[in-house]
């Protein structure tokens, strides 16, 4: 599947190649496998035919010589390769050829992994001293339960990951016929198809129909009852997190929830939460709400930091605001202001090739309508206060949410 947005104004090309190889496919006990495997994809390519092997230093020099950038990363749902290069024919051809090698011929050297493993373990050890890390880990596990969305990389899970694990994960995930390739830049459709084929040329060329179907990933289970966790920690600020599983990215109510969340806590200083918790009571510098929809129901989260002795008061106000918003919905004035702000800021979502690429990749990955960007503002404008009240009541259950408070004091 190849999506192209022609952008001839600048002689550049941005490409993203996505595969179903995100952390949702991490095996139990090996949390972090996808992200660690993705990091190793940047550390060397194997020799093939007359092409010599290249270590990470040689790759870095090669990309610098081309004035191009290449990267690999694993998110929650997908494994992504990105390429940014000049569209001048000779440089473009060389950049695509080198990217194809990194996509199709990773070295996965054990000596490199053993070195990088120590860096990962040191990073985890440092992260475990941060209140936000500890609170976030407890929150994710409580919201998602046994679902992979709640898996958290630990020293134990890193120790369980081997180079053979990475190779197996890569082989299962990076399959040419399952790639979704998105391009934005100074090329035409014919060039886009050629580049897409070239990027996948080093992978086995097999039809998806002949391959076993990817194992389904279970859906996120709704919460059956409220969960309250209070974690002792000596810190200058207490961490407060409240939320639950939300909705999928392709949910028909996406735009309704977008506007609704802007009013509740996504709009910064114009949101209800900020007004009630910060402006009226001075209990925090900032409080925000967000949804993280993906292929599965990502979390709805309200987060804030406050003085340890004010945590209980801040939490009480936060819960009250959520309950009232879900029960009564927004006012007409709030809806108009939110829609005006969102529509007014739409241009900033697509004002660069990289932002366009992110949007096009999002459309392709989530099977959204091809006119998604063309109709974005109109869909926001159609949202009503009644829509928001109904959608919030359907998606959120304030009496069954997870609450994590870390570092509170009486």
Residue map of PLM features:
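M16/insulysin-pitrilysin zinc metalloprotease superfamily fold
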Residues: 3, 44-53, 83-117, 267, ...
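C-terminal regions of mature proteins
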Residues: 1, 180-186, 221, 304, ...
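An aromatic/glycine/proline-enriched structural segment found at the starts
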Residues: 146-152, 180-248, 405-410
């Amino acid at each position: 599947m190849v999506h192209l947005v022609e952008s001839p104004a600048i002689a550049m090309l941005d490409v993203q190649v996505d595969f179903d190889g995100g952390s949702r496919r991490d095996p139990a006990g090996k949390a972090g496998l996808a992200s660690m495997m993705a990091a190793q994809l940047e550390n060397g390519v194997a020799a093939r035919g007359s092409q010599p092997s290249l270590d990470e230093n040689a790759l870095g020099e090669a990309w610098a010589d081309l004035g191009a950038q290449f990267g690999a990363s694993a998110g929650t749902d997908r494994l992504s390769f990105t390429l940014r290069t000049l569209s001048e024919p000779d440089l473009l051809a060389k950049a695509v050829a080198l990217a194809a090698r990194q996509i199709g011929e990773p070295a996965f050297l054990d000596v490199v992994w053993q070195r990088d493993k120590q860096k990962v373990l040191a990073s985890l050890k440092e992260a475990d001293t941060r209140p936000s890390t500890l609170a976030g880990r407890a929150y994710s596990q409580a919201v998602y339960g046994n679902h992979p969305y709640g898996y958290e990389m630990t020293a134990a899970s890193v120790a369980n990951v081997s180079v053979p694990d990475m190779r197996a994960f890569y082989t299962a995930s990076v399959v040419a016929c399952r790639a979704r390739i998105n391009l934005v830049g100074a090329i035409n459709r014919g060039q886009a198809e050629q580049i897409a084929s070239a990027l996948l040329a080093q992978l086995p060329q097999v039809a998806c129909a002949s391959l076993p179907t990817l194992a389904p990933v279970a859906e996120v289970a709704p919460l059956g009852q409220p969960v309250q966790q209070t974690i002792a920690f000596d810190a200058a600020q207490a961490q407060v997190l409240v939320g639950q599983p939300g909705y999928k990215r392709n949910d028909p109510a996406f735009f309704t929830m977008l506007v609704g969340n802007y009013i509740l806590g996504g709009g910064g200083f114009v949101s209800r939460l900020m007004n009630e918790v910060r402006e009226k009571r001075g209990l925090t510098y900032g409080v925000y709400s967000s949804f993280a929809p993906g292929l599965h129901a990502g979390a709805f989260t309200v987060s804030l930091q406050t003085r340890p002795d004010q945590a209980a008061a801040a939490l009480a106000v936060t819960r009250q605001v959520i309950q009232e918003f879900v029960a009564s919905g927004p006012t007409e004035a709030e809806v108009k202001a939110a829609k005006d702000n969102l529509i007014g800021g739409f241009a900033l979502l697509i004002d660069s090739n990289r932002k366009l690429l992110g949007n096009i990749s999002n459309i392709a990955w989530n099977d959204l309508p091809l006119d998604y960007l063309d109709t974005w503002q109109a869909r926001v404008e159609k949202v009503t206060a009644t829509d928001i009240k109904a959608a919030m009541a359907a998606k959120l259950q304030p009496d069954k949410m997870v609450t994590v408070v870390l570092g509170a004091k009486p």
